[in-house]
């Protein structure tokens, strides 16, 4: 038997994980957090500034649509704002992981918090998507008529704000997977 060979039943203690891989994942984590923060901020601002008044409003009756008229849209703006704030604050921890790539406990905490924020972001985006779908297509079973034919600008803006939120959802999945890989390499 060769001197360097491993017998069956023995555990090989190969070379420790390269710091370059973990550091590269940490740098990518930092960049993805910035992109996700921009996406959630854009979604919150896009939905939060949505309003339209129809041109045939009278002096006493105004036909207008505002995001705050729908509680689901308020939840969407709130959840995106909370997640954006978290992402900005987590940049400090992400930078710490670039400097100290051997930190494991803080990575576990970050994976836990990322998962919580992923859940919050997904619920806000999914709930808003259901309402946007109803606004575009209505529901004939409940006699809810689509109102996007009248409020065209309003519907375009609320539909567009969903895009940034779902981009952030995908980025959170990538962030969680990258953090898990980073932890497993220690």
Swiss-Prot record:
Single biological process term from Gene Ontology: cell-cell junction assembly
Cytoplasmic face of the membrane: 1-26, 94-110, 184-186
Positions in the Extracellular compartment: 48-72, 132-162
Residues passing through the membrane, by range: 27-47, 73-93, 111-131, 163-183
Source organism, top-level taxon: Eukaryota
Localization per record: Cell membrane
Keywords recorded for this protein, A-Z: Cell membrane, Cell wall biogenesis/degradation, Membrane, Transmembrane, Transmembrane helix
Subunit description: Homodimer and heterodimers.
Sequence similarity: Belongs to the Casparian strip membrane proteins (CASP) family.
Protein name: CASP-like protein 6
């Amino acid at each position: 038997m060769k001197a360097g060979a491993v017998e069956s039943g023995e555990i090989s203690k190969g070379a420790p994980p390269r710091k370059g891989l973990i550091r590269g994942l940490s740098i990518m984590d930092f960049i993805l957090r910035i992109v996700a923060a921009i996406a959630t901020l854009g979604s919150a601002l896009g939905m939060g500034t949505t309003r339209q008044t129809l041109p045939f409003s009278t002096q006493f009756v105004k036909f207008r649509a505002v995001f705050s008229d729908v509680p689901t849209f308020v939840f969407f703006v709130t959840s995106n704002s909370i997640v954006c704030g978290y992402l900005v604050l987590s940049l400090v921890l992400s930078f710490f992981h670039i400097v100290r790539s051997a930190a494991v406990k803080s990575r576990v905490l970050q994976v836990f918090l990322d998962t919580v924020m992923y859940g919050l972001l997904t619920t806000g985006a999914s709930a808003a998507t259901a309402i946007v779908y109803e606004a575009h297509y209505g529901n004939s079973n409940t006699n809810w008529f689509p109102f996007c034919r009248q409020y065209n600008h309003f519907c375009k803006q609320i539909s567009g704000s969903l895009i940034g939120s779902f981009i952030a959802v995908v980025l959170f999945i990538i962030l969680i997977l990258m953090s898990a890989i980073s932890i497993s390499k220690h």
